Amino acid sequence: MEKLLDEIYDSVPQGGAQSDGAESANFNLYSFDDTGNAQRFFNLFGGEMIYNHIDKMWLYWDGKRWHADLDKETYRRAAISVEEMRKELEFYQNQDDSDGTENAKNFSKHIKYTRSMKGEKALIEMAQQLLPVLPSQLDRHIMAFNTASGIISLKTGELTPHNPKWFITKISEVEYSAGNNYSCPRWLKFLDEIFNGDKDLIHYVQKAVGYSLTGKTSEQCAFFLFGTGNNGKSTFLDVVRDIAGEYAMNIQPETIMIRTATAAANSDIARLKGARLVTSVEPNEGVRINEGLLKQLTGEDTVTARKLYGNEFEFKPEFKLWMATNHKPIIRGTDTGIWRRIHMIPFTVSIPEEKKDKQLKDKLEREYPDILRWAVEGCLLWQREGLEMPRAVREMCKEYRREMDVISAFIDDRCEVAEKSFAKASQLYAAYVTWCDENNEHKFSNTKFGVEMAKRFEKKRTMDGWFYVGIKLLQ
């Protein structure tokens, strides 16, 4: 991997500040125009500035990561480049011949032009051509996690110094020190409280959080945190999001629900490129998950997205979705393809108001460095053990799937399953439609209903039409 990173870094043009002794030898290489200005800028900042032509954005190395220039750092450095041109002017002024005098006169005029808005803008635009970088060259190492202390290898837990060659653009501001030991007693007590002492569940959650620090999506799952209020799930999610830092993003729950504004949804998805942990909180009751989109986002396939007013682009999702909810989002699909992706984590403990720790958030923040070590240890455990659901999660998922199975609910309520019974398909569907209307349930089409019933019962054709064998309508 290090060799690959060296090759990528070497492919990006590098400049660098000149030494005092080399200045006079290089001054004659610069032209008195925009191209020369760009070359001056390049030689000063070529190792610290890059330009992403696809996203049309400058990035600068701040000592820890490549930072998107949202605060006009490029213009500040352009101003420094112009100030450095005074040394070049002095070089020409110190020449005794007529060429030196003429050059000094012309260069003085050129400096005045370069200081103008037009000249400064031209300098920056020309420099873009000298310092190109592709989006594919950024954040390539999905098992590296950048922190205030250095880069964590999520394969080993070891820490290495910050390095521009890694082309990392994100960071968690949490400090980290390598080692197997961590001390976060209030965090561990909090987990014990909200998960009711279920050690298997806590062990699973530690691995899930650690897995979510990586850019891998091999588990192909989303985490739903379910429970009524006052159970700690929001606090839990806040802590996980905080230690993930810039690797975490939040989305409105509507992004992954069925809705008509597909353009807005696609723009929301475009924001998630490069994120590793995506959180969402409290979808409205009765909303339905966009199952096709959820499958796509939790898989390992390429996604097509488009920023608002921008062009389409493709990327592979690296994020894991964590959604906290008091209401179970509606899932109409009955296939394993959707249900195997849902990991519903139960939050069954309700914490009374009088027992709430008002200082809990502050106490947990003081433990962030060790909570990060706890999460990295979870990542190492995940790589050794996998992410098999514990009993509490399996049972919650099973209950969730049963609740979402409208046809099974209809059969339980209006039918009798018996080996030698039979029911006419048209009558069964009519009864199903009536039952859905009475219970305010979503109705499948006749075709979809037939497909689902055929999974459960044998279907035969007679002179009187189609019948299902092994079921009858209750009178």
Question: Where on the chain are the PLM-derived regions?
Answer:
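Feature primarily recognizes SF3-like P-loop helicase cores of small DNA viruses
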Residues: 14-57, 85-475
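N-terminal acidic, proline/glycine-rich, low-complexity intrinsically disordered segments
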Residues: 1-14
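Trp- and S/T/G-rich repeat-edge/linker motifs of beta-rich repeat architectures
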Residues: 57-60, 65-78
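Acidic, aromatic-enriched beta-alpha/helix-loop junctions
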Residues: 72-90
